[in-house]
Curated annotation (Swiss-Prot):
Belongs to the universal ribosomal protein uL18 family. Gene3D superfamilies: 3.30.420.100. GO terms for cellular component: cytosolic large ribosomal subunit. It comes from the Bacteria. Coiled coil: none annotated. One of its GO terms (biological process) is translation. This is Large ribosomal subunit protein uL18. Pfam families: Ribosomal_L18p. SUPFAM superfamilies: Translational machinery components. Part of the 50S ribosomal subunit; part of the 5S rRNA/L5/L18/L25 subcomplex. Contacts the 5S and 23S rRNAs. One of its GO terms (molecular function) is structural constituent of ribosome. InterPro entries: Ribosomal_uL18_bac-type, Ribosomal_uL18_bac/euk. It comes from Ligilactobacillus salivarius (strain UCC118). This is one of the proteins that bind and probably mediate the attachment of the 5S RNA into the large ribosomal subunit, where it forms part of the central protuberance.
Length: 118
């Protein structure tokens, strides 16, 4: 019997490969994305200190939108505004092993439009 590969396990393997190559510092932190079935989360992380500097998710009251993609772009805008307020302009984008498409792409483009460089 042919079994399908577990999508989340392959994503985790892909994420581990990417994380081996990138890490965030205080000068250029890492913008991490996590996507669940209902929500999307974004964090700006300083890996040297092991501290989350800024975060946003669809659970925040500032986030609006009807579709999941609209909500993701709203999360990107909110996390970018919060990062710029803290003086963070340049980040390294960590897509979390997800394909750069759909909600992840919408979040990244909204973050770029609102002042983050990556």
């Amino acid at each position: 019997m042919i079994s399908k590969p577990d999508k989340n396990k392959t994503r985790q393997k892909r994420h581990a490969r990417v994380r081996g190559k990138i890490s965030g510092t205080a000068e250029c932190p890492r913008l991490n994305v996590y996507r669940s079935n209902k929500n999307i989360y974004a964090q700006v992380i300083d890996d040297v200190a092991g501290v989350t500097l800024v975060s946003a998710s669809t659970l925040d009251s500032e986030v609006s939108g009807n579709t999941k993609t609209e909500q993701a772009s709203s999360v990107g805008a909110v996390v970018a505004k919060r990062a710029v307020e803290k003086g963070i302009k340049e980040v390294v984008f960590d897509r979390g092993g997800y394909l750069y498409h759909g909600r992840v792409q919408a979040l990244a483009e909204a973050a770029r439009e609102n002042g983050l460089d990556f």
